[in-house]
Every structure is written in C-alpha cells, then in structure tokens.
C-alpha cells in the first residue's frame, strides 16, 4: 500500500491544496492520502508587539480547520483528514507523525510526504531530517520557475526528480495553482480559490474576520492616527466577545453566529456622510430603506449587512438581520416578538462592551452589564429606552 502524508497549517484550505493532493496521488498511484493540519506554525515570524498583526497570525482553532478540510474533501475517494498533530500537547514534528502512522498501518508499506520547494530549501533545519529521508519519499511541489537543482535555465525546468543526500526527491513541475491562504486573506477574495461550501463555513463562523475588518475599517479610513483606526477594530472584537459570553448564557448553539454578528457589526462604520449617502443611493433598491432615515450615522448597519451579503457571500439571515438592526432594532418589524435573541444581544453588547463609559455611553452601565446576563429582555428594553432619550 502507498500512503501519502500531507501536513500543513491549512488555514484556510484552498483549491491548490486539493489539487496537490489529487496530483500527488496520481503521480505515485497512491492508495491513501491523509491531510494533517498542524498545531504550530514553524518558521513563521510573529510580531507580538503589534496586537492586531499577532492576532491575525494565530492559527485558526483546529476544529475549524478540520471541519473545512472535511468539507473540501467530502467527495474525494481515499482521502482522509486526521487530527493527530492537533492533539499533540507540544510542537508536532514530522518525524513523530511518520512514526505514528507507521505504527498504525505498518512499516512494510510505502510512505510519501508532500512539501513545497520552499520547505525543501530549509529542510536541514527540520528535526531529524535525515531520518525523515529514510522513512518516507518526498514529493516536492515546485514553487516558481527556478530549478530546485539549480541546473536548468529559469522558466524551463522539466526535472522529474533529483538526488538529495542520496535520496530521490520526486518533483512536480506542472502545477499551475498560484494560490496561498495568506494572499486570499489579504485580498479577502473568498469567492475564488476555495470551495463554496468552505466559504459558507468561514462566513458562518466569522473566521478571518480581522483581515476583512482591516481592509474596510483601515483602508477606507481617513484618520492619520493608526491608533484611532485600530480602535474601531478592537471595539468590534470586544463586542464580539461580549456577544459570545451572552450567547453562552442564552443559547449555546448560536455562539458562533453571535461572534460573527459582533465582529462584523461595524464593518462600514468608517464611511463618512458623503460616502454613506452615496452607497445608500447606489443600492437603494436592494437596501429596502426609505429616504426618511433618521440620520446618515445609522446607515452603516444596513450598509454593512448589504456589503457582507452581496460582496462576500454571507447567507445567514440571523446574522445579517442582527447587524442591520443593531442601530435601529425596531425598523422593519411589526412588534417586539420579531426581535431575535441575537438581535438583542448584539444591541446590548454594542452599548455595554468593556470600554464603554458611564454617563457618556450609558447611565448605570455597570448595573446593566450585570443585568444583561440575568434578564436580557429587561436590559435590552431599558438600554434601548435610554439611548432613545439621549437622541432627543
């Protein structure tokens, strides 16, 4: 039996990962391929002094990466997803993973290991790299057009293998997927390069939200002070956490949706009056809002939900409605009973998150921060009434 081990962050899994798996299996006529998301980022520089960048470079929780891999591979034959490396308490090293699967399936089989040519260049930095070469055959996917052996003219390499410390490395040259998870997150172009069902999962759970918030809250913002730009993102993060904490009390099944609504609720808060009205006028027929809206300052809730749905493929109406209603919760509903638990939680979290201040944002704020965990309806009504009085 021929078994291929495919290790990596898979954060997020994209079409190139799936194409690599298929091509590797075809190359060696493999019987089984196992995806193994890792529990640690090796060789990645992390700036812990920049909180936003640090949060962006953290690995997405393993259960989400496993779920996305299972979605992306659900129709593929002889391809499995394993959480072996995720379960390791310490850093999971390739040599340990190889030994584990040889114990499971037996050492008499042929084992292969997929890597990119960028990793091959620093392979001697890997733990027990010489043992790895003895235990498995390497399938190397070439990145770029430069010959790994440094012997072919650039852009014309056709090497199928080469000798690496007396071990044959199988080379894949005709791989034409120029995709990376980081580039997808930077552009937040999630409508191409990944399985549509994976996109739905990402949106449903609010994954990679900081990249999208940064794109809109910073790129479109005219503040010169980076602190003020980042403050908006941090407000969204605090609201998201409070939404999660509240939903943990009121409906644990909706915790992910609570996070998603909280993290994205102010995605277009950066738009000024001219930009908000221009967006409104351009999409008026889709927004279903009359021209008599109370103030341009409340438009960001409707515009944000519209942006998420039309540009980024969000489908969950529970999340989208909560975002729409977080400034004017009673617009477009007939009575209080139509408001969802998520609507009320997002509204309260936005007004009561830890950085909101007494008198300026909400009177008796500590009282309401406690009350909202005990009686959501009472807290919502009283906070809403106070906010309405403040606007008069």
UniProtKB/Swiss-Prot annotation:
Q: What is its EC number?
A: 2.7.7.18, 3.6.1.41
Gene3D superfamilies named in the record: HUPs, Hypothetical protein af1432
Annotated region Ap4A hydrolase: the residues are 230-392
Task: Quote the catalytic activity from the record.
Answer: nicotinate beta-D-ribonucleotide + ATP + H(+) = deamido-NAD(+) + diphosphate; P(1),P(4)-bis(5'-adenosyl) tetraphosphate + H2O = 2 ADP + 2 H(+)
Record's keyword terms, sorted: ATP-binding, Hydrolase, Iron, Metal-binding, Multifunctional enzyme, NAD, Nucleotide-binding, Nucleotidyltransferase, Pyridine nucleotide biosynthesis, Transferase
Source domain of life is Bacteria
Write out the ranges of the annotated region (NaMN adenylyltransferase). 1-210
Biological processes, Gene Ontology terms: NAD biosynthetic process
| Binding-site residues for ADP, renumbered to this chain | 235, 266-269, 300, 326-327, 350, 356
Listed pathway(s): Cofactor biosynthesis; NAD(+) biosynthesis; deamido-NAD(+) from nicotinate D-ribonucleotide: step 1/1
Q: Would the keyword Metal-binding turn up in this protein's UniProt record? A: yes
**A GO term, aspect molecular function:** bis(5'-nucleosyl)-tetraphosphatase (symmetrical) activity
Q: Enumerate the spans annotated as HD domain.
A: 232-355
Q: Which residues bind Fe cation?
A: 235, 265-266, 350
Q: Which InterPro entries match?
A: Cyt_trans-like, HD/PDEase_dom, HD_domain, NadD/NMNAT, Rossmann-like_a/b/a_fold, YqeK
Q: What does this protein do?
A: Catalyzes the reversible adenylation of nicotinate mononucleotide (NaMN) to nicotinic acid adenine dinucleotide (NaAD).
What's this protein's family per the entry? In the N-terminal section; belongs to the NadD family. In the C-terminal section; belongs to the Ap4A hydrolase YqeK family.
Q: Which PANTHER family match?
A: NICOTINATE-NUCLEOTIDE ADENYLYLTRANSFERASE-RELATED, PHOSPHOPANTETHEINE ADENYLYLTRANSFERASE
Protein name listed in UniProt = Probable nicotinate-nucleotide adenylyltransferase/Ap4A hydrolase
Q: What gene does this protein come from?
A: nadD
